[in-house]
Structures are given as C-alpha cells and as structure tokens.
Amino acid sequence: MMATALQRLGRKRAVVLHGREGLDEAGLGDSTDMMVVGQEPHTLDPQTWGLTPAPVTALAGGDVGENAAILQNVLQGRGTSAQRDVVALNSGIALWTAERVDNIGAGIALAQDILASGAAWDKLQALIRLSRVQGETN
C-alpha cells in the first residue's frame, strides 16, 4: 500500500521495508520484506551479503546517554558487530535507493568502509559545528 502511494506520488525509486522481527527497517535476525516502487516484492536475507545473523535483542539500547554512546561507537567504526552490521545494511539499502551505488551489496560495502574509517563520525561532527554556527547567527 505504501509503495503504491509512493509510486502515485511520482517517486522514481522508493523502498518500503518490514523486518520480519517486527522492525520498520532491515534486521539481522530474520528476512526483511522489501517493496520497491514499480517492482515485485523482494525478500532480503542479510546473510546474502556476509552479515552475521543477530537477534533484535543484540540491538537494544538504553537511556539517552547509552544510546548516544552506541551511536558514537558505531559511527567511529566501533560498537558491536550487530550494531555495525545493521547500520551498514540499512545504509546500503538507502545508498542504493538514492542511486549512489548500483546494488545493495555495493551500498553495504561502501557503508562499512565509511563506518570503519570514522568518516561518518567526522560528518556528524561537521554537521554539529555547522548547526551551532547557524544557531549563533540567528
């Protein structure tokens, strides 16, 4: 239904995901149902791209401070394997959807490289600095 609505809105490429673990994103513990505008439904299996299966409980966060620490660790190329893999999987899908890569596997590989290098953390820090400067000028 959502994919049909996106198609009617004229979206060239859009993706709707439903992780079978009850997630609104791709997960690592089970397959993910994926609808791409104008295509037949797909089923994604994270193991296809060499990602290690992990239950949704492996992704549990906590309070604001703990979640911020998890985000920092993942964006700096640290964090648990499950945390890094789920971010790479969903980022890879997003990169493919945005037509930055030719396929989801290439998107996952690019996301893994960006995370491992710490470039994702550097980008977030640049965005924070820009936001502060903009806040000071307004």
Regions found by a protein language model. Give the residues of each.
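Glycine-rich anion-binding loops and their surrounding alpha/beta cores
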Residues: M1-N138
